[in-house]
Amino acid sequence: MNKFATLAVIFCACIVGSCYANYGGQQSYGQRSYGQDSSAASAASSAAAAGAEGQQRYERPVEIIAGGYRGSYAPEILRPIQVSGGYGGERRGYNGGNYRRAGYGPRWTVQPAGATLLYPGQNNYKAYVSPPEYSKVILPIRPAAPVAKLFVPENQYGNQYVSQYSAPRSSGY
């Protein structure tokens, strides 16, 4: 029984070791940044080794930094998004060409700089609109001269003429 258990443990260790053979081994990453995968590097090396014979064309992966100003004052973590392989672009099977299998997540594409969004909100592009800034101008306010001399009853304009042409009033009858 003890020999059987020992052989079973050794057999399972061999199976697990063959599944994860390169897990703890040495890997040559080179100058890689966050978000790149090793299949792109292997595709570049195989395309360079093929030389003029190979018709394979290697396209470099493009990274778009997602995030930025969204109306809040809190800093947001910027993370790179890999355009080439994020939607199954480099996993080309026997169909070849531009066939892409359906993947998860948004379809990120590269938008040319200075492009105008014709239909905003219908794609994954984010339009960055700066808040409006108004210039502050202080205008001098001075009271203007009166346009006309208006009749005000409290001033009693015209009373000086009444006393000249009218008879004096007598208080006793």
Swiss-Prot record:
Cellular compartments per GO CC: egg chorion; extracellular region
GO MF annotations, alphabetized: structural constituent of egg chorion
Entry superkingdom: Eukaryota
InterPro entries, per the entry: Chorion_2
Signal peptide: 1-21
Keyword annotations of the record: Secreted, Signal
GO biological process: chorion-containing eggshell formation
Subcellular location(s) of the protein: Secreted
Main location as per UniProt: secreted
Similarity field: Belongs to the chorion protein S19 family.
Purpose of the protein: Chorion membrane (egg shell) protein; plays a role in protecting the egg from the environment.
Protein name: Chorion protein S19
Annotated source species: Drosophila melanogaster (Fruit fly)
